[in-house]
């Protein structure tokens, strides 16, 4: 750990990131009754806008908590990279966009991640379960309706990215994170 010199993270940041990871975990648990509907995409994009590369800390805290609760089984392994893809897509976007553009772009990125979640997950599923390429394509096709639900949920949540990111940036400045 380090001070505000720019290297490492401060104790304050570590505590905040732990709470943000726990918030992701609690939000997913609360929304478990709805198949593939959650605010994880919203939170990942907001955290990435506010904390950039440090956003990986709460993301991986959430992934670890998920594994601890549900077990570190084969379903968990793709989570190690699938959620980082959304983080990476957000990192590649310009930091400063006009509000109307940002609203559309962030919502679109969040929606597309939901739509292609099964495609991103499929290679690990195929490797871990012994599916050949055709089996993997069939696996993707059989789950596509859930990816559509995921995309619709991410679209709805994605509409909140701009106001939530502005609030997170304000809190970040206020608490000197």
Per-segment meaning from a language model:
Residues 9-17, 41, 55, 59, ...:
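Residue-level signature of transmembrane alpha-helical entry/exit and packing/kink sites
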Residues 43, 85, 89, 120, ...:
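Hydrophobic/aromatic residues in alpha-helical transmembrane segments
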Residues 4-9, 93-105:
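Membrane-interface helix-boundary motifs at transmembrane edges
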Residues 1-50, 54-62:
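Hydrophobic transmembrane alpha-helices
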Residues 25-38, 61-96:
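Interfacial aromatic-anchored transmembrane helix boundaries in multi-pass membrane proteins
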């Amino acid at each position: 750990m380090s001070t505000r010199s720019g290297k490492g993270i401060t104790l304050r940041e570590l505590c905040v990131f732990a709470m943000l990871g726990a918030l992701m975990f609690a939000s997913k648990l609360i929304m478990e009754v709805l198949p593939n509907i959650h605010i994880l995409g919203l939170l990942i994009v907001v955290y990435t806008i506010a904390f950039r590369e440090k956003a990986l800390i709460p993301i991986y805290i959430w992934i670890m908590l998920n594994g601890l609760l549900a077990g570190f089984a084969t379903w968990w392994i793709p989570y190690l990279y699938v959620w980082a893809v959304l983080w990476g897509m957000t990192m590649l976007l310009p930091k400063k966009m006009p509000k109307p553009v940002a609203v559309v772009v962030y919502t679109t990125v969040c929606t597309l991640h939901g739509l292609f979640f099964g495609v991103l997950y499929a290679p690990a599923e195929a490797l871990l379960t012994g599916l050949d390429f055709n089996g993997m394509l069939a696996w993707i096709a059989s789950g596509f309706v859930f990816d559509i639900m995921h995309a619709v949920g991410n679209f709805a949540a994605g509409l909140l990215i701009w106001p939530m990111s502005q609030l997170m940036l304000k809190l970040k400045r206020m608490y000197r994170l």
